[in-house]
From Swiss-Prot:
Its EC number is 4.99.1.9. Keywords: Cytoplasm, Heme biosynthesis, Iron, Lyase, Metal-binding, Porphyrin biosynthesis. It comes from Streptococcus pneumoniae (strain Taiwan19F-14). Its main location: cytoplasm. GO terms for cellular component: cytoplasm. This is Coproporphyrin III ferrochelatase. Involved in coproporphyrin-dependent heme b biosynthesis. Catalyzes the insertion of ferrous iron into coproporphyrin III to form Fe-coproporphyrin III. The gene is cpfC. Belongs to the ferrochelatase family. CDD domains: Ferrochelatase_C.
Length: 364
């Protein structure tokens, strides 16, 4: 039986041009092209950081895993929102005769909002899949962050005051209302690293970053809002974006530009440890994750039954929740429906699937 590992990531623009960024942004927005001013802002951000190394770094990570596991598994790589797209790579795997596939998403934490969006594409009549939900507790990954933060504390902070800010990509509040484990995993991840460092509870905190402006509330505090709200600041802030493993725009711009600039304004020294990227400790964590899961059950994936539809609204969106006073419908959805009209609101289908997942709404 031919087995494979499919390593997946979010993706990035295939070329740093206005239209290249527009294509990527349109994919993220479910095929709806954003307004030109939105594209221009994102394009300007990419120009500010000199492009994005994400695809290069990810391919190097894939090759390093292949060096370790390539004799046992075919190693494949796909993106969620840029080429090579997940469905195209699955077709290639089918052509290659793959029958079982371990899906290793290059995001250490599990969230309905993010990881289930990958699961949507895992459709094959030939291949059975095993999706690894999370792997943030791998000791070598914890050791990476601990070691790199400790270097900053020892070599750059010394005896001066500091605070470690663990930041993670924000998710919409409704994801948490229906049992999403993401926020608990982020807090647990931060605690594990802080314990290894011997930090006191007042020496670190959690914030959120990189939320999208899509008209719905996201979990708080946003990292920039947190900084502005503090009445007193330490001499050093150490920003640790633990929900990511590779350098990309949400680290290189959201942290290294926006957080850095605000620290300059506040008179505080900005620090960020290097990202795991291709470090051997990350590769150890990825390999150990595969080993810890490879004997679990593989199954045929039926995306419409396994996940909510993150990328496209149902054809019957307007019929899903007919009454805007349905008590199970979040307030912001009611407001969206009142403002835009039911036919133009894509969110209720997402909410419905999450309610089903949480057992609060019977499946059809």
């Amino acid at each position: 039986m031919k087995k494979a590992i499919l390593m997946m990531t979010f993706g990035s623009p295939e070329e740093i041009s206005f239209e290249g960024v527009a294509e990527f942004f349109t994919n993220i927005r479910r095929g709806v092209r954003p307004q030109d001013h939105e594209i221009q802002t994102l394009y300007d951000n990419y120009i500010r950081i000199g492009g994005t190394p994400l695809q290069r770094i990810t391919r190097e990570e894939v090759n390093l895993v292949k060096e370790r596991l390539g004799e046992e598994y075919g190693i494949y790589f796909a993106n969620k929102f840029s080429r090579p797209f997940i469905p195209d790579v699955i077709k290639q795997m089918e052509t290659d005769g793959v029958e079982e596939c371990i899906c290793l998403i290059l995001e250490p934490h599990y969230s309905f909002y993010s990881v289930m969006g990958y699961e949507k594409f895992l459709e094959s009549q030939q291949i059975r899949f095993l999706v690894i939900k999370d792997w943030y507790q791998q000791q070598s990954l914890l050791d990476f962050w601990t070691d790199e933060i400790r270097k900053i504390l020892r070599n750059e902070v010394g005896e001066e005051s500091f605070k470690v800010i663990f930041s993670a990509h924000s998710v919409p509040i409704f994801a948490l209302d229906y049992g999403d484990p993401y926020i608990d995993q982020i807090f647990d991840n931060s605690r594990l690293i802080a314990e290894q460092l011997g930090l006191m509870t007042d020496q670190y905190t959690n914030t959120w970053q990189s939320e999208s402006d899509i008209g719905i509330p996201w979990i708080k505090p946003d990292v920039l809002e947190y900084l502005r709200e503090q009445k007193q600041h330490p001499e050093h802030y150490i920003f640790v974006p633990i929900s990511f493993i590779s350098e990309h725009i949400e680290v290189l711009f959201d942290n290294d530009v926006e957080c850095y600039d605000l620290c300059q304004e506040l008179g505080v020294t900005y620090h960020r440890p290097p990202m795991p990227n291709t470090d051997s400790r990350l590769i150890d964590a990825l390999v150990a994750t595969v080993r810890a899961n490879e004997d679990k059950e593989f199954k045929t994936f039926l995306p419409e039954e396994e996940t909510f539809d993150e990328l496209a609204p149902s054809a019957t969106t307007k019929d899903i929740m007919k009454e805007t006073d349905d008590l199970q419908m979040p307030e912001f959805v009611k407001k969206l429906i009142e403002k835009k009209g039911r036919e133009n609101v894509k969110m209720p289908y997402l909410i419905k699937k999450m309610l089903e997942k949480a057992g609060k709404l019977p499946k059809e």
